């Protein structure tokens, strides 16, 4: 059985716990949240994981997990993932956009090397990451990502200061530029852009367009890649989580799949 600690108990974390509540190969020992969120977390996980402890940090060495899953946002990488890696605990990371922060990727890699652990960046809401990473081996010429979401998904971002999102009546470009800038300006919306960049041409050479489209109620991801392998084009239409329109439901499923690959006898 794989013993897991999870950082975060928001829409993604709760979705993961619900889908895996009956998996005999997985045990969620702890959920890690800030102190002010402990009571809310206990109430949220009670229907799915009544025996899971709610804590503010990793358990003591004797009770440490086999694996840490980060579902809490960018600050969690510094606060929880770095020390877990240093202790030799493998980590699964959802908030891939955080690695655009200067120096953080290097800090995480150094922690993993010191602890002889591994950090796996999850594909989240996007597909074809395996193909893109394989294509990089032979050489990539261009990777272009276009993310199209309903206006409400851009609330709480710099786009809300630039545009009246409730009044948009046509598709509006809210950002165009490098993946590194997209991830810094739209950290809660740019995990896909960062994941594609890290799998492919890097943060500085991956071109990103982010659109607010009032005619849709789903998150649409469009990826074009060209290189020595040839080329591919991917379109994904992902339903957002009801509890968080900034996040695709597929993100939850990608965490579930990654955990299954770690815990089960056969993986794909």
Swiss-Prot record:
EC number(s) reported in the record: 1.4.1.21
Tagged with keyword Repeat: no
Uppermost EC category: oxidoreductase
SUPFAM superfamilies assigned to the protein according to its UniProt record, in alphabetical order: Glyceraldehyde-3-phosphate dehydrogenase-like, C-terminal domain, NAD(P)-binding Rossmann-fold domains
Pathway assigned to this chain's UniProt record: Cofactor biosynthesis; NAD(+) biosynthesis; iminoaspartate from L-aspartate (dehydrogenase route): step 1/1
A single MF term (Gene Ontology): aspartate dehydrogenase activity
Superkingdom, taxonomy of origin: Bacteria
Keywords from the named record: NAD, NADP, Oxidoreductase, Plasmid, Pyridine nucleotide biosynthesis
Biological process per Gene Ontology, one example term: NAD biosynthetic process
UniProt-annotated binding residues for NAD(+): 125, 191
Active site: 221
HAMAP family reported in the protein's UniProt record: NadX
Purpose of the protein: Specifically catalyzes the NAD or NADP-dependent dehydrogenation of L-aspartate to iminoaspartate.
Family to which this protein belongs: Belongs to the L-aspartate dehydrogenase family.
NCBIfam families, A to Z: PRK13303.1-2, PRK13303.1-3
Descriptive protein name: L-aspartate dehydrogenase
Annotated organism of origin: Ralstonia nicotianae (strain ATCC BAA-1114 / GMI1000)
């Amino acid at each position: 059985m794989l013993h897991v600690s999870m950082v975060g108990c928001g829409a993604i974390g709760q979705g993961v716990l619900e889908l895996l509540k009956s998996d005999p190969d997985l045990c969620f020992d702890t959920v890690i949240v800030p102190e002010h969120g402990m009571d809310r977390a206990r109430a949220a996980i009670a229907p799915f994981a009544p025996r899971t402890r709610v804590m503010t940090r990793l358990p003591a060495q004797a009770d440490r997990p086999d694996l840490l899953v980060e579902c809490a946002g960018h600050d969690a990488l510094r606060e929880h993932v770095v020390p877990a890696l240093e202790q030799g605990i493998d980590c699964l990371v959802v908030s891939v956009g955080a690695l655009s922060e200067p120096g953080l990727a290097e800090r995480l890699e150094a922690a993993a090397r010191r602890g002889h652990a591994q950090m796996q960046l999850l594909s989240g809401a996007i597909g074809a990451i395996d193909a893109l990473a394989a294509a990089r081996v032979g050489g990539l010429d261009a990777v272009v990502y276009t993310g199209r979401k309903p206006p409400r998904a851009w609330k709480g971002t710099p786009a809300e200061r630039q545009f009246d999102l409730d009044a948009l009546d046509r598709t509006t470009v809210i950002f165009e530029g490098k993946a590194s800038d997209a991830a810094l300006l739209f950290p809660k919306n740019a995990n896909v852009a960062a994941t594609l960049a890290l799998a492919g041409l890097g943060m500085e050479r991956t071109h990103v367009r982010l659109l607010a489209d009032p005619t849709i109620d789903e998150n649409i991801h469009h990826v074009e890649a060209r290189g020595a392998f040839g080329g591919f084009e991917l379109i994904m239409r992902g339903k957002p989580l009801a509890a968080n329109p900034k996040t695709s439901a597929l993100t939850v499923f990608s965490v579930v799949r990654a955990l299954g690959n770690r815990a089960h006898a056969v993986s794909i």
